[in-house]
Structures are given as structure tokens and as C-alpha cells.
Amino acid sequence: MEELFSIDQLDLERLLKEWRWLCPQPVTLLARNGFGDLFLRTAEGKVLWLDVGGGTLSEVADSESVFRDLLKHAPQRELWLAEAVLEAGARHGLKPNNVQCIGFKIPIVFAESAAVPDNAYVADLYEQVSFLGDLHRQIADTPDGGKVRLRIGAPPARR
């Protein structure tokens, strides 16, 4: 399987810094998609999908070999890699490189994002993944449709 984005030069700890509230266990990076989602292998060999847009971490395969086999099937590739959406973005000039991803001015976790024209842009991968980790940490306990108040800046000091 040919990877869409090289992961060789990525700093996993930097990518996961704002996600350790959701993913505290030691993991290695297997792959990523064009939206900054990360596919991680646990010490036990299971494969996890960190969906940075949705703010979820889910087990998707019992092993790396099962994960790679699943990626040979178009429906699974579309679910995890969103290749058709990436191709559509590329036709509109959105072509992230290996340290970039497609981000959204209003994150897709907010219903309002669907109404924003030209919401997508090419973002720095580290900044986007970090921002979304902090965002999802702040709204993790908010019910769907609930009101949120976001804090931009350093997190409050822990006591």
C-alpha cells in the first residue's frame, strides 16, 4: 500500500501533546490522512484511529497487518483516508504536503462549519492537530448541541 503522506519525519510526541488526555498510552505512528487524523499502534499491537476532527479515539484493527489489509478495500480507505474529499480539495487548490493537512476555519465538530463557504484551507499539521486536541479537551463533556465557551491561550494552572 502506498502511503498518501510520509510520516517518517513527524514528531509523534509533538502531535499528541494536546491529545494525551484522550490517548495517554504509549503508541507509535503508522499512518495519517490528509485531515490530520492519526493511525497509531499500541504496545499490544492494536491499531487506533485518532479522529482529530471528531475528537475520538477508536480501535480499528487488532494488528497492523489487519489494518493494512483493510486499507486495500475502497470503502474502508474512503472512511479512514477520505480520498474522494482530498481529491475534490486538490481540484480547488488544497494540496497539503507532508507537514500540512486540510483544516477548517470553523472546525467540523461545530454544526456552523457546514454553512461557511470556503471553510477549508491548508494548515500546518502540528498547529491543526494541537489546536483540535485542546478544543476537544475543552468540549469533551459538553452534550451535542450544547453551548461552549472556548479559552484561547495557556490552560489554567492546575492546583
Where are these regions (language model features)?
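A surface-exposed partner-binding patch
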Residues: 1-49, 106-159
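Compact, glycine/acidic-enriched structural inserts
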Residues: 50-87
